[in-house]
């Protein structure tokens, strides 16, 4: 598994993820890039789950974004519909955290598209640890979205054996 966290604060949204890929109880690779920019760098996305499955979903999601001229929610709903109803796609095991300058969403294989409370997303095996840490920082500090995401991933990496400290981030600032 992994940890992906998305934090939105003061006109900035950040998605960060660790780099560990495991097979069973063995670390296969420590520098997987699980966070990407999509649709002309206007959308950022991170995945938790099977790497090959996630790359397939990134490609499909980017096609949906192009089809719907970058409308994040519409593209997410259409991907979730296909993911749930297509026999081959149904077998893909991953979660996606996606964001543009105004909206953050979680997309699942059961057809769910969820806009989380407080625009805070944390998915993967270390998600609960990262979410608790990020929520505490959002409510009690003036740290930036990037600083909160970094610290939340660091805490998750200290606790979750399927999360490492080799993290990467993508961020978007609103034009306000």
Swiss-Prot record:
Allosterically activated by HslU binding. CDD domains: protease_HslV. It catalyses: ATP-dependent cleavage of peptide bonds with broad specificity. Its EC number is 3.4.25.2. InterPro entries: ATP-dep_Prtase_HsIV_su (IPR022281), Ntn_hydrolases_N (IPR029055), Proteasome_sua/b (IPR001353), Proteasome_suB-type (IPR023333). The keyword Metal-binding applies. Pfam families: Proteasome. It is found in: Cytoplasm. GO terms for biological process: proteolysis involved in protein catabolic process. GO terms for cellular component: HslUV protease complex; proteasome core complex. Keywords: Allosteric enzyme, Cytoplasm, Hydrolase, Metal-binding, Protease, Sodium, Stress response, Threonine protease. It comes from the Bacteria. GO terms for molecular function: metal ion binding; threonine-type endopeptidase activity. The active site is at residue 2. Gene3D superfamilies: Glutamine Phosphoribosylpyrophosphate, subunit 1, domain 1. Na(+) binds at residues 157, 160, 163. Protease subunit of a proteasome-like degradation complex believed to be a general protein degrading machinery. Belongs to the peptidase T1B family. HslV subfamily. HAMAP family: HslV. This is ATP-dependent protease subunit HslV.
